[in-house]
Structures are given as structure tokens and as C-alpha cells.
From Swiss-Prot:
Family of the protein in this entry: Belongs to the class-II aminoacyl-tRNA synthetase family. HisZ subfamily.
GO BP, sorted A to Z: histidyl-tRNA aminoacylation; L-histidine biosynthetic process
Organism domain of life: Bacteria
Chief place of localization: cytoplasm
UniProt entry tagged with the keyword Amino-acid biosynthesis: yes
Protein name per Swiss-Prot or TrEMBL: ATP phosphoribosyltransferase regulatory subunit
GO terms under cellular component: cytoplasm
NCBIfam families membership: PRK12292.2-1 (NF008939)
Function (record text): Required for the first step of histidine biosynthesis. May allow the feedback regulation of ATP phosphoribosyltransferase activity by histidine.
SUPFAM superfamilies, A to Z: Class II aaRS and biotin synthetases
GO MF annotations, alphabetized: histidine-tRNA ligase activity
Length: 392
């Protein structure tokens, strides 16, 4: 019999589960305030849904052995978008939904086998919202949600913002057949590969400068406007940054704009972003999101409301940030109920029911005690902080 969990997954102790619940409820309270309604997408989906029309590589999906192609969800956006385009298609737009649940990310382990990473996520999706107004709401909600967590971080988190339209600007003079090669070099910051491409196409040497042009949004937008005047995407980003800057300052978040930033999954076709915190040994992405209109359209939505955008926090990664676990985890008063040899388990259960009716947490020790002093010794062993004695 196997005594260890599968590669990539782990058991959570009661304190970790409680902390996950606290973080999830803190996020959910903000989502509800903003008018978002909870949904529960399935963990198992058809592969064509999980791949989001080719936006997610099938190698990132954990497949199930079944009569039809099924898999475990690597993220929740595709499942919720499917529901929004089918079961919820007649509901009024904008449609605001939030969800929480486990996602399963498949990756190649060091020894060559499949490693499944199981993570708890909690996020929102906004359907049928057009224009920069939708991005204004979504990123404002991200800020408000993170602020509600009140995490004691030693360094300010960084909100990294990109836009697929910026990459299109950078590559607008590159032959379309060469876009994938140049895009990979820029997004992966691969200077050597980019230099090799430029050696054969020297007219694109200017692309090298964009590998180093990331940082304060105002400065980056100014550089982009010099290179690409009157680009509509820059006007949208300017409006977005002007709104976010004061919010970021009050929330303690640093903003960074990167024209070459592209997310892990190719879901997005507009604004993209990720929130990065300092972890124990390296930076940790605790939230990511963006706009995914194309995915919604591939799932059958049509017309002006065929839009979608959202974000998701990784609750497990939030919990594991330095100081985040110990700060707000509260200890609930727990009562240990012990009974003497002259009493019975039935009497102890009746006494426990009375405490439960008062809303008190109480557990019964199944074995009678010879003395109350013995019960007090069991109290320390049980991890409870008060004793209820049934006896003489």
C-alpha cells in the first residue's frame, strides 16, 4: 500500500485548511460587495472545453481514462465561460460570477514522469463588458480584494501589466510568418535567439531595445508613444494607469508595465496581468488574469456581448507567503468534555449537546477519568483550552 501522496500533491493539516478558509472568505466578501454571484464549475470537463479552442496545450491537462476525452481542469476560466455561453446565455450582461475550487496543473517531473500540482483558486469572471471600463472594474476589484487580505508583507507586491496589443505593435513590421519566432524571443527574454534572428533580418534590430523597457507605466507608455504615436491601445492603457496609480499607492502595490509580457496560457487577447509577491526564496505569482474575448466567441457567444475577462488568486500560494499564515489565523476556543467513572458516555453526550446549543466547540473524551486531575492532564494532550467536567 502506498504511504505517500502522489507526486506534486500534499496533505493539508487542520490549521492550513482553516487558513485557506479565512483567505477564501476574505476574498469572497469583497466579490459579493461588488455584485458577483458564486458558481461552482465541474472539476472534470471535456478536453475540447479545457483546451479553450487551442489556447491551452493538451500537455498541461491531466487526462482521465474514460470513454470520451475528459480531463481535470488546469484553470477555471474555460469551464465558467462555457456555462456563461450556454446555461447563462439569457442572463443580463454584464454577468458577474465568482468561484473557488481546486485546479490541477500537469507538468513533467524531474525524473520524467507526470507531476500533478493541486492548487486552490478563488477568482472572478466578468462577461459581456466592453471597453476599458471593464478593465477599470476588474483591476480595481483586484486591488480591493488584495487589500482585504491584510497580509503582513515585507516588500510591496508588484502588479505586472501587459497587453497583447503592445506585442502586435512591436511586431507590426515583421512578416506574419516570423511572428512566432520573434514573439518567443521577446516573451522569454532570449537575447541570443533574438540576435540570431536579427543577423538575418537586420531591419528588426530595434526590437532588442524592448527587452529592457519595462518599469514605471508612465515612462514606458511615453516611450511607446514616441515609437507608435496615436495607437489606440496606448490611450486605453493611459486611462487605466491614471486610475490605478492612486489605488496602488494606497494598497501598497507597485505597478510595472512590460510590453513583452505574455501569460502562461494563450487564453488572452487584450489586457493581461499578474500579481507577484516576495516568497520565501523567490517571487511568487499569487494572482493572474486578463481579457479573453476570443475564448468566449469560440464557445459560441455572438454579438457585442461576446466578451470576457477575469482573474484568480491562488489561495495556497497566498497562505504560504512569509508571515501570511501566522498573522491572522485565529484559535477557536475548544472545550474538552471528560466524565468520571461514575458517569457514562451517554451523560457526556447530553452535556455536549447543551454546549453545542450555546454555540460552543466541544469534543468528548471517550474514556472515563478516575479524577478531575487526570482530565486536566488529558486537556493538555488534546490541544483544547478549557475543560468541562461531568462527574462527582
Amino acid at each position: 500500500m502506498a504511504l505517500q501522496p502522489a507526486s506534486g500533491v500534499r496533505d493539508l493539516n487542520p490549521q492550513q485548511v482553516q487558513r485557506n478558509h479565512e483567505l477564501r472568505e476574505a476574498l469572497a466578501a469583497v466579490y459579493r460587495l461588488w455584485g458577483y454571484e458564486e458558481v461552482a464549475p465541474p472539476r472534470i470537463e471535456r478536453m475540447d472545453t479545457l483546451k479553450a479552442g487551442g489556447a491551452i496545450d493538451s500537455r498541461d491537462i491531466v487526462r482521465l481514462v474514460a470513454d470520451e476525452p475528459l480531463g481535470l481542469r488546469p484553470e477555471m476560466t474555460a469551464s465558467i465561460a462555457r456555462a456563461a455561453c450556454t446555461r447563462f446565455q439569457n442572463r443580463r450582461r454584464p454577468l458577474r460570477l465568482w468561484s473557488h475550487g481546486t485546479v490541477f496543473e500537469g507538468r513533467q517531473a524531474d525524473e520524467g514522469g507526470l507531476c500533478i500540482e493541486e492548487k486552490l483558486h478563488c477568482g472572478v469572471e466578468l462577461f459581456g463588458a466592453r471597453g476599458v471600463e471593464a478593465e477599470l472594474e476588474l483591476l480595481s476589484l483586484l486591488m480591493a480584494s488584495f487589500k482585504a487580505l491584510a497580509l503582513p508583507l515585507s516588500e510591496p507586491p508588484q502588479l505586472l501589466i501587459g497587453h497583447t496589443g503592445l506585442m502586435q505593435l512591436l511586431l507590426k513590421n515583421v512578416d506574419e510568418q516570423d511572428h512566432p519566432a520573434y514573439r518567443n524571443c521577446l516573451t522569454q527574454l532570449d537575447r541570443l535567439a533574438l540576435r540570431e534572428l536579427i543577423n538575418t533580418q537586420p531591419q528588426h534590430a530595434h526590437l532588442q531595445q524592448w527587452l529592457d523597457r519595462r518599469g514605471a507605466p508612465d515612462a514606458v507608455i511615453s516611450q511607446l508613444k514616441d515609437a507608435f504615436p496615436d495607437a489606440p491601445v496606448l490611450q486605453q492603457l493611459t486611462r487605466l494607469i491614471n486610475h490605478l496609480s492612486p489605488l496602488a499607492e494606497t494598497t501598497g502595490i507597485s505597478l510595472q508595465l512590460d510590453p513583452t509580457f505574455q501569460p502562461m496560457y494563450a487564453l488572452y487577447d487584450g489586457i493581461v496581468f499578474q500579481l507577484v509577491c516576495r516568497g520565501t526564496s523567490s517571487p511568487v505569482v499569487v494572482a493572474r488574469g486578463g481579457r479573453y474575448d476570443t475564448v468566449v466567441q469560440r464557445l459560441g457567444a455572438r454579438g457585442k456581448d461576446a466578451t470576457g475577462l477575469g482573474f484568480s488568486f491562488c489561495v495556497d500560494d497566498l497562505r504560504d507567503l512569509p508571515g501570511a499564515f501566522a498573522m491572522t489565523t485565529s484559535r477557536t476556543d475548544r472545550i474538552l468534555l471528560c466524565y468520571s467513572q461514575n458517569s457514562s458516555m451517554e451523560q457526556a453526550l447530553q452535556a455536549q449537546a447543551g454546549l453545542h446549543r450555546r454555540g460552543l466547540s466541544c469534543q468528548v473524551d471517550h474514556h472515563p477519568c478516575e479524577t478531575k486531575a487526570e482530565a486536566e492532564e488529558r486537556l493538555r494532550e488534546a490541544g483544547c483550552n478549557s475543560l468541562e467536567w461531568v462527574g462527582d
